[in-house]
Amino acid sequence: MTRRNPMRREMPSPACPGHRHAPPRQAIETGARQMRAAPCRPNRPGKARAPRAARMMALAGSALAAGLLLAGSAAAAGFPAISVTEGTGGTSYLLSLQILALMTALTVLPSLVLGMSAFTRIIIVLSILRQALGTQQTPPNQVLIALALFLTFFVMQPTLGALYEQSLSPFLDGQIEAQPAIERGGAIMKDFLIANTRQNDLLMFSDLAGAGPYAEPTEVPFSTLLPAFMTSELKTAFQIGFLLFLPFLVIDMVIASILMALGMMMLSPMLVSLPFKLLLFVLVDGWALTVGSLAASYWGQ
């Protein structure tokens, strides 16, 4: 009679890896009967799927073939070029060239507006005023630019009104052609530019261009008048900025002297003088004086 070692544990026979078994001490025989009744069948692998890259390549090839087919049919049809004809027997202009000229004009338009208006003087004076106050980025650049633009429209209102009444409105009503309208508008802008340009700057650019002297100021071409006007605007803006800077500079010097006398050399004079400069600017109504002086510098001439 064979003795069974109590320490020896009977291990279950290897079963299918896909089946789970109960604990060996409780269901060894149950597991064996289940294995005999339903033998393990190997799992069938699923159908191989087409790679995603292959499908994307197929879609791209189909789109490319469709595009080539459409391009070939359009070329075979021979579509005519789009053109605009002015009047009977007029000149035919390609629409693409007109669009190119219009886009070029729109690109240059902001520079022309800034260079032929009061914007340059106004924005420089406001920037110098902010630096004199020592407020760093207060008011911010967006506020200064908006104020300069609104003040520019206010100053240019008489000139813009004359442009509309004498040039744009008759052209839109069909009373005059495009060329006379451009000539009238150019004459109005010349009057504004000449009225705000120093003679010395005008003579300097005329000599540099090798032209002149001119019998009438209206005979000066825009190629000479525009740089002379910009130079005059810069000079006038710096003169106004110098006058605005002086009182705040005096306050800074007084505060610095007082701090040095008290032995507070580590304390920044700009930090101490800022409240006094703001108080002075508010008491004298500085914004109204600055904006009014800028407007009067154009209208007073």
From Swiss-Prot:
Q: Give the record's membrane topology.
A: Multi-pass membrane protein
Region described as Disordered: spans on this chain: 1-24
> What's the main place this protein lives?
membrane
Instruction: Tell where it localizes.
Output: Cell membrane; Bacterial flagellum basal body
What parts of the sequence cross the membrane?
64-84, 99-119, 143-163, 240-260, 264-284
Return the NCBIfam families for the record: fliP (TIGR01103), PRK12797.1 (NF009438)
What's the name of the protein?
Answer: Flagellar biosynthetic protein FliP
Write the gene name.
fliP
